[in-house]
């Protein structure tokens, strides 16, 4: 009785034991202490308070453009520039210009009335031209409302969700599957077979491609049916980009699962790799929200390259040559990851 009374209380001893077990798990320490700080830092950098940015307005390059451009440049809050007529649709779609002024008497405003920033641009341009005349002009500008395919947020979001789906499906389906097989001693049994490691690892990648094709088609069909999201570049180019991305993330998944011993371990490693890309790679908001100093590094992330290539095809109608830089980044990630996975992979 005396010894028991002198020792620690059972509740205190059990609590201390659970605390020690928790802090010995690196994954738990990361999610509890590190991840909230990383998340706050990333989102704080992306949405930090900035000064008021000027509204981009294009002036069609034609007779009469010079005085219009001068009036807009003198007004506050506008960033005016001259553009040839053939570039107007791309500028309006991508946000390079919120409104296009066609010089004339009266001038014509080309803009997408469904976009709030375009409606604001019209008000600012009206005020700038009235101020240049010294009074309210005796004319009312003509308006030419244009519907720019791919200019809605949902059009911009769907390629990001496709890229995120490719990354998650490839990495979890391959890396997690390897660790599960290892924990169940299935890989150990394969040592006695004449199977080559490269064939085994390649089979994991190829099997995931079949599932990925179904997943992508389902999301594309849903987006087209419910929201009217289109694909300007065609299914062949989109499939080629998705395939390159799947192979790249498949190689990364192989690498993460090649040495991990436990399911908890591989889960922590994959979440550590994927969550920063979910935040930084432009899935839900543009990479340009981040400071310019870090944007070159973000552009080198595989998910950033994949999403940029998907958006280039779906929104801009780019051919594969137009997204060659992004495909090169993905190919490099896949080749290096797969080569390293072959070197470090172990059966037990």
Over which residues does each language-model region extend?
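Transmembrane helix-loop junction
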Residues: 45, 180, 189, 193, ...
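Alpha-helical transmembrane segments and their short interhelical loops
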Residues: 197-270, 275, 320-327, 331-339
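Extracytoplasmic/periplasmic domains immediately adjacent to an N-terminal transmembrane anchor
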Residues: 1-154, 322-325
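Short helix-capping/hinge motifs at transmembrane helix termini and TM-loop junctions
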Residues: 43-51, 175, 180, 223-231, ...
